[in-house]
Regions:
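N-terminal accessory segments that position/regulate proteins before the catalytic core
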Residues: 1-187, 238-270
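Small-aliphatic-rich amphipathic alpha-helix that forms the alpha element of a beta-alpha
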Residues: 109, 135, 189, 195-197, ...
Length: 270
């Protein structure tokens, strides 16, 4: 009982302290996407984005020091990690609509996202070890005793809680703006942040740390997906309001910060 009371007191204290962090909250709320806003911008920039010269330019370094001494680095070493980094992909060219991900793969993907390691710590770094993120996932396959649907991941028990399995959950056109070649995902991860878990200590700067942590989660998912010959794609084009409504979160205290598609590509062979 005392442990429960201490948690409640800590949460209340964190909430009251975080109320002064208005800059990060204002920024986050004013940069949310909706279908109307995002689609208009995408149409305006389509010609530029499809230009080979533009794509070449974006892959070049911004800074170059021609008058300074240069040192050539060695080629990367061999091993599983370097192989996965080399083979990691974000684009699906030939989606496999009949792909089936078994329960072992599903378990490893959620564990890689935010699970606990052998030292009873999370598998990603977190500023102050505060772990402000929550992991949700839409699973598109039925298993023996496991139904497809929207789930929440509990790292402490390594379990999934079914939140919703209505038809609207699987209609990605309702909450993803652009999903060309991603019409047949196996899993969609939603990474959300409970901001007060970090802002009570770091104030507005906590927002930076939260995004860094979300990036580490997405990279872990990507590497585990590569291990299983899957493609992972981070999606910035979510309709944030629709996603938060589906997750049943308020969008203020807890809000989406990243989305990752997992799919099978017929051309992706390690």
């Amino acid at each position: 009982m005392e442990h429960f009371k201490s948690i409640m007191i800590s949460n209340d204290y964190a909430t009251r302290l975080s109320s002064k962090c208005v800059l990060s909250q204002t920024y986050h709320q004013n940069t949310k996407h909706s279908k109307r806003y995002l689609m208009s911008n995408m149409y305006q920039s389509r010609v530029l984005l499809n230009s080979p010269n533009f794509l070449k330019a974006t892959q070049s370094p911004e800074r170059y020091f021609p008058t300074q001494q240069h040192f050539k680095l060695n080629a990367h070493s061999s091993g599983l990690l370097t192989e996965y980094l080399d083979k990691r992909r974000s684009q699906v060219h030939s989606p496999d609509k009949d792909a089936f991900i078994d329960l072992n793969v599903l378990s490893d993907l959620f564990w890689a996202a935010y699970g606990k390691n052998s030292q009873n710590k999370r598998v990603v770094p977190s500023a102050g070890a505060l772990y402000p993120l929550e992991i949700y996932g839409i699973v598109f396959n039925d298993y023996e005793n496991f139904k497809k649907g929207l789930y929440h991941y509990n790292p402490s028990t390594h379990t999934l809680s079914l939140l919703d399995n209505g038809a609207h959950v699987f209609d990605i056109s309702q909450y993803i703006m652009r999903y060309q070649n991603m019409e047949h995902p196996s899993i969609i991860f939603f990474i959300t942040a409970v901001f007060s878990r970090a802002t009570f200590k770091y104030d507005d700067r906590a927002y930076r740390y939260i995004l860094l942590e979300a990036g580490a989660v997405a990279q872990n998912i990507s590497l585990m997906a590569t291990h299983y010959n899957l493609v992972s794609t981070s999606i910035g084009g979510t309709d944030d309001f629709k996603v938060e409504e589906m997750l049943k979160i308020d969008g203020n205290h807890e809000s989406i910060v990243d989305c990752v598609f997992i799919a099978k590509d017929r051309e992706a062979v390690l």
